[in-house]
């Protein structure tokens, strides 16, 4: 868990009865338990607006050539695992790889990771693409049009770009070291690969590339996952429950207030 060993000395060893701890999913909970195993931690996941109900300009993805488009978004840093995604793409059989398009979006905070992506783009210029930055309306349009989201993070409490994909009914392939992995039902609303292993990610990618119609059929299940865990209403319900447990106040009185 990135960072926790370095801040453990700043985290209280005990909590008073009026202090409750909430975490954004199972991965963040496990991270805290790695340094404070006795803490009782509740789940409280953020809520995102329903971007699918908004209007925004269409972002041009013609470079994908009508092929399934696999997208990852985030600053280039070791924690985000762009190198794992690069290696997985290289491991695909040529006849499989050429049936898809891959887009990396993010600023190059780590030069070695940017070099890995640049090399991949150079080797497969008709298949792999890079954009340093997209504006918010472009991201929304991209999520609406892409086929699948890929999150290869080595440590990621709850990646928001994966959630944004769910808003538009898009399945994801995520590392087990993400908060999203704790909510996905395998093969129903997404896929999880283990051990930060590019070969295991490549296996999921190959299946997804060969079965775009099955990914499309996951749309409603992905949308349901968003509404159940990530919608603004789900967040409001979770926050009210957390406050009720802390104060002993009834849910009815919270709603009235």
Region locations from a protein language model:
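Conserved acidic donor-binding segment of nucleotide-sugar-dependent glycosyltransferases
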Residues: 186-187, 191-198, 207-212
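Conserved donor-binding/catalytic core segment of Leloir-type glycosyltransferases
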Residues: 22, 62-80, 86-89, 103
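A short, well-ordered alpha-helix in the C-terminal region of glycosyltransferases
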Residues: 200, 207, 214-229, 235
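Short alpha-helical donor nucleotide-sugar binding micro-motif in glycosyltransferases
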Residues: 133, 141-146
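Short hydrophobic beta-strand element within catalytic cores of glycosyltransferases
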Residues: 171-174
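Membrane-proximal helix-turn-helix segments that form the acceptor-binding/catalytic region
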Residues: 1-21
């Amino acid at each position: 868990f990135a960072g926790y060993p370095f801040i453990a000395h700043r985290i209280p060893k005990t909590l008073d009865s009026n202090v409750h701890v909430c975490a954004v999913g199972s991965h963040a909970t496990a991270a805290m338990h790695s340094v404070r195993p006795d803490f009782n931690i509740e789940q409280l996941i953020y809520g995102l607006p329903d971007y699918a109900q908004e209007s925004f300009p269409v972002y041009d993805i013609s470079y994908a050539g009508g092929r399934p488009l696999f997208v990852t978004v985030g600053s280039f840093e070791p924690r985000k695992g762009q190198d794992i995604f690069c290696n997985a793409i290289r491991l695909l059989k040529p006849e499989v790889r050429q049936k898809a398009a891959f887009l990396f979006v993010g600023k190059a905070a780590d030069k070695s990771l940017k070099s890995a992506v640049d090399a991949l783009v150079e080797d497969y210029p008709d298949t792999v693409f890079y954009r340093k930055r997209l504006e918010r309306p472009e991201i929304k349009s991209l999520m609406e049009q892409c086929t699948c989201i890929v999150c290869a993070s080595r440590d990621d409490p709850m990646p928001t770009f994966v959630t944004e994909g769910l808003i538009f009914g898009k399945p994801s392939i995520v590392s087990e070291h993400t908060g999203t992995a704790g909510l996905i039902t395998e093969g129903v609303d997404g896929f999880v690969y283990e051990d930060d292993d590019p070969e295991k990610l490549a296996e999921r990618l190959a299946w997804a590339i060969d079965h775009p119609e099955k990914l499309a059929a996951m749309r409603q299940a992905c949308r349901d996952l968003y509404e159940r865990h990530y919608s603004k209403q789900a967040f409001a319900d979770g926050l009210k429950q957390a406050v009720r447990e802390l104060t002993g106040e009834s849910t009815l009185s919270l709603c009235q207030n």
